[in-house]
Amino acid sequence: MNKSMLAGIGIGVAAALGVAAVASLNVFERGPQYAQVVSATPIKETVKTPRQECRNVTVTHRRPVQDENRITGSVLGAVAGGVIGHQFGGGRGKDVATVVGALGGGYAGNQIQGSLQESDTYTTTQQRCKTVYDKSEKMLGYDVTYKIGDQQGKIRMDRDPGTQIPLDSNGQLILNNKV
């Protein structure tokens, strides 16, 4: 064989071995490509949202009293009682019966007017409202415990990372990786 051919084969073999050696160094020295997720705990916040809850209710009112002292009932009762009392007895007894009838009638008229005033009512419909709170949960993120080799770390993420978190060439977590 020719010396130049042997030299060419030797240079080719040496170059191939050199490339293979450099490639194998990079493969064997390369660290992990993913961090293993040990746990991912959801972080939630309870949110109370206020709202108005209204309903219509029937309300009974007493009409305003125009004769608070019930004078009308007392006077009418006294007159009626006096007339009825005057029908009994004779002489001086008639006068006593008239006075007793007037007093009894006045009292009865007063009580009747009071009873009528208390039962003099009207109804209206009113809207009654109260504030109630609806509860809901808002997801804040996840507290993630991860492991790279023998080292363990914690981080808060806004999504569940699954079982692995990718690493960049420097061994740092890639957190903006869209899934």
Curated annotation (Swiss-Prot):
Any one of the GO BP annotations: regulation of single-species biofilm formation
- What parts of the sequence cross the membrane? 5-25
Q: Give the subcellular location.
A: Membrane
What is its membrane topology? Single-pass membrane protein
> What GO cellular component term, any one, is given?
outer membrane
- One Pfam family from the record: Rick_17kDa_Anti
Record keywords, A-Z:
Membrane, Transmembrane, Transmembrane helix
Q: Which family does it belong to?
A: To Rickettsia 17 kDa surface antigen.
Supply the name of the protein: Uncharacterized protein YcfJ
According to its UniProt entry, this protein's organism is Escherichia coli (strain K12)
